[in-house]
Amino acid sequence: MDFFNIHTHIAKHPESEIFSTDVHLFSSVSKSKFLSVGIHPWYLTDHDVENQLEILRKAIENKQVVAIGECGLDKLKGPSMEFQTSVFKKEIALAEKHGLPMVIHCVKAYNELIQIKKSTHPQQPWIIHGFRGKEALAKECIQHGFYLSFGAYFQEDALRAVPIEKLFVETDESELSIEDIYLRIAHARGMELKELTESIKKNVERVFFKP
């Protein structure tokens, strides 16, 4: 049974996970088969942003890279929202140019994120990773075309509100196994584990490995 993990910082199963790394660590990553690389809002620096963007431009030419991220907006940590937004829009442009989905970090900035999506009209999928919001927020995100990825901690009502074709599963930094998280999610949604794994596999193939 395949338990695909779309976002992890702890490499364990290279054939069935996407290892997420920030641009400043990209050169040290070698073991993982599939990578996502981006400029995390926590690590944005005004004096070094052009270098960060140049590393990202070069990194996404690597065939291991199947997504841009994590990237996004964070009101609790990082530089000003204006600066975060300007860099995020440049990452959006790169994702569109290279046909790559985006794995998004969003903290207390969902209104801003939705407005950016509405104004930029992206053609590539946007996945909000580690979603912990409530049911109403989950429904709003789905309405605006986002995919939602759930990890070790989640609101069950929000999880159940997500259509299966918009759902992903991840470990992020958790020490829990991806199998355990799949089991929790299957139980919360009242579905068979095999049905969940097969559905997520289809989503992964459609979003990250499209022909």
Feature annotation, model-predicted:
Residues 1-211:
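Mid-domain alpha/beta scaffold segments of enzyme catalytic cores
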